[in-house]
């Protein structure tokens, strides 16, 4: 689709199939010849093997990449990586901080709730938007270490002092026990109880992010 044109950077959080789909990346590469890939160590090597002409920037946790007024930082997440039988942990997973045009945006990637959220304000004292997963969270005894719940997503956003929380990672793949559209309903209800500002876009909706200062 035309909305996927003129992409400058493709951010891949980790190598799991629901986050790194080769046919989807192929379409993005074909439609965006100047697009660059920013990802964790090892993931770029895998993708560049599929698309040798793609410019790849790999990063370890806390490494930054600057391009004009844009700064990307690869950050820790509580998750894991694995694509085949014997490659578990070979590629680094993580989250992103995107700083551009006086707006700071956090993207959690896949993660469980952990201490890394509380550490973010030390490095990024003014986070405007927190994009964070809310789906694939049941049953909790199994999903809790690696997939954050709608409740913990709001707690994590508060931990990092984000102004606005935007949910993601729901309503696409049937990966867990909760109904596909349970997460946004729970998230919206809980955010209202806590008095936290959220943006809950429709799937596929384009939103324009505003500056706060």
Model-derived regions: residue spans:
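Histidine-centered active-site/metal-ligand motif
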Residues: 14-19, 79-81, 107, 147, ...
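Alpha-helix capping/helix-boundary segments
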Residues: 16-17, 43-44, 63
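Cap/insert and terminal regions of metallo-dependent hydrolase folds
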Residues: 9, 24, 36-38, 42-45, ...
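Core dinuclear metal-dependent hydrolase active-site scaffold
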Residues: 1-4, 59-125, 203-213
């Amino acid at each position: 689709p035309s909305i996927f044109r003129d992409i400058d950077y493709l951010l891949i959080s980790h190598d799991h199939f629901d986050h790194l789909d080769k046919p989807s990346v192929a379409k993005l590469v074909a439609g965006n010849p100047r697009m660059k890939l920013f990802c964790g160590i090892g993931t770029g090597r895998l993708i560049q093997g599929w698309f040798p002409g793609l410019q790849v920037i790999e990063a370890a946790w806390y490494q930054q990449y600057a391009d004009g007024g844009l700064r990307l930082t690869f950050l820790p997440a509580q998750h894991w990586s694995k694509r085949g039988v014997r490659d578990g942990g070979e590629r680094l997973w993580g989250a992103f901080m995107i700083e551009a045009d006086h707006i700071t945006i956090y993207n959690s990637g896949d993660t469980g709730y952990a201490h890394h959220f509380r550490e973010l304000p030390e490095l990024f004292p003014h986070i405007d938007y927190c994009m964070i997963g809310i789906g694939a969270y049941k049953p909790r005894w199994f999903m809790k270490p690696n997939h954050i719940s709608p409740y913990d997503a709001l707690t994590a956003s508060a931990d990092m002092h984000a102004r606005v929380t935007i949910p993601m990672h729901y309503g696409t793949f049937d990966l867990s026990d909760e109904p596909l559209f349970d997460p946004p309903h729970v998230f919206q209800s809980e955010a209202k109880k806590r008095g936290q500002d959220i943006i809950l876009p429709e799937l596929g909706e384009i939103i324009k992010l505003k500056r706060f200062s």
